């Protein structure tokens, strides 16, 4: 068996997909490495071990061998009834079918045991630090040189970035899932642009009059007094590519996948803290400024 491995300071990674096939069914989950089973990773063709293995074994199930029929005690051996019939089953077409009742089925049982597997290990990479394998749903991009020089399993340790479209989608979905409608709302929500406005409570309600019959020319005006208690201010807008005056999203990036995920989390946390910040107009300056809502 030919294997490839990656040695790190905290583990040893092993795979039997030596040709890097896209669709591949690994057999390593059925084997024992120095007496232990390998731990699965989120990549189905790679497994994690504590160290580079010295012995690989396959568990062989218990099996029954040497099936035969032996003549029961008390019955005489003859040409028609031999002492042993070497067969695992006597069917209707057998010459011994009529005397089958004179025999007991016998066999030997071999217990479960481990069979050593000959293997050849090719350590394709050695890493001084720890390798942290993390699952993700990103479509990662790398520079050409890293793609040429680095094994696919180790690409996640290299600098990476997301496309503008994917970065925009992450931001858009996160805002929609976490916005507090009491303090902000989305006014434009499209694949090509997103706008969020801040909802500010007025320091003093603004009185205004509306004509309920304004749309009916022949009716007398019916006036109603109303009060405006809130106003809206644009706080965030973004687009995946050039569109009108919208700022183009800056793609997420990181020195590796772990750093990328950390950068995405920090950006989204900071953004939502800004969007959901509870602000109201300041009474002291009569709405020229805003302050935190203490309620």
From Swiss-Prot:
- How is this protein organized at the quaternary level? Binds the Gabija complex as an octamer and inhibits its ability to bind and cleave DNA.
Listed under GO biological process in this entry are: symbiont-mediated suppression of host innate immune response
| Keywords annotated in UniProt | Host-virus interaction, Inhibition of host innate immune response by virus, Viral immunoevasion
Which protein are we looking at? Gabija anti-defense 1
| UniProt family annotation | Belongs to the Caudoviricetes Gad1 anti-defense protein family.
Domain of life, per lineage: Viruses
Organism the protein comes from: Bacillus phage phi3T
What happens biologically when this protein's gene is inactivated, per the record? Knockout of this gene prevents the phage to overcome the host Gabija defense.
Write out the function statement from the record: Counteracts the host Gabija antiviral defense system by suppressing the ability of Gabija to cleave DNA.
């Amino acid at each position: 068996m030919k294997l490839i491995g990656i040695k790190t300071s905290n583990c040893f990674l092993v795979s039997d997909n030596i040709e890097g096939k896209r669709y591949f069914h690994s057999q390593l989950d059925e084997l024992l490495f120095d007496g232990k089973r390998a731990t699965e990773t989120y990549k189905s063709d790679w497994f994690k071990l504590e160290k580079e293995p010295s012995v690989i074994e396959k568990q062989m199930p218990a099996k029954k061998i040497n099936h035969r029929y032996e003549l029961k005690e008390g019955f005489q051996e003859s040409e028609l009834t031999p002492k042993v019939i070497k067969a695992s089953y006597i069917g209707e077409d057998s010459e011994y079918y009529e005397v089958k009742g004179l025999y007991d089925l016998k066999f030997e049982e071999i217990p479960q045991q481990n069979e050593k597997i000959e293997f050849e290990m090719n350590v394709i990479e050695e890493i001084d630090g720890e390798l942290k394998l993390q699952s993700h749903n990103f479509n990662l991009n790398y520079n050409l040189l890293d793609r040429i020089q680095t094994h696919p399993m180790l690409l996640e340790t290299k600098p990476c970035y997301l496309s503008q479209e994917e970065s925009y989608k992450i931001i858009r979905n996160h805002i929609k899932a976490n916005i507090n409608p009491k303090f902000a709302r989305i006014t434009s929500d499209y694949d090509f642009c997103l706008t969020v406005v801040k909802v500010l409570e007025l320091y003093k309600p603004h009185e205004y009059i509306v004509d309920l019959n304004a749309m009916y020319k022949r009716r007398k005006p019916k006036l109603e007094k109303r009060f405006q208690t809130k106003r809206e201010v644009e706080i965030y807008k973004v687009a995946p590519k050039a569109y009108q005056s919208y700022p183009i999203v800056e793609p997420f990036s990181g020195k590796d996948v772990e750093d990328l995920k950390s950068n995405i989390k920090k950006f989204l946390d900071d953004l939502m803290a800004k969007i959901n910040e509870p602000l109201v107009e300041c009474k002291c300056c009569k709405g020229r400024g805003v302050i935190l809502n203490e309620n």
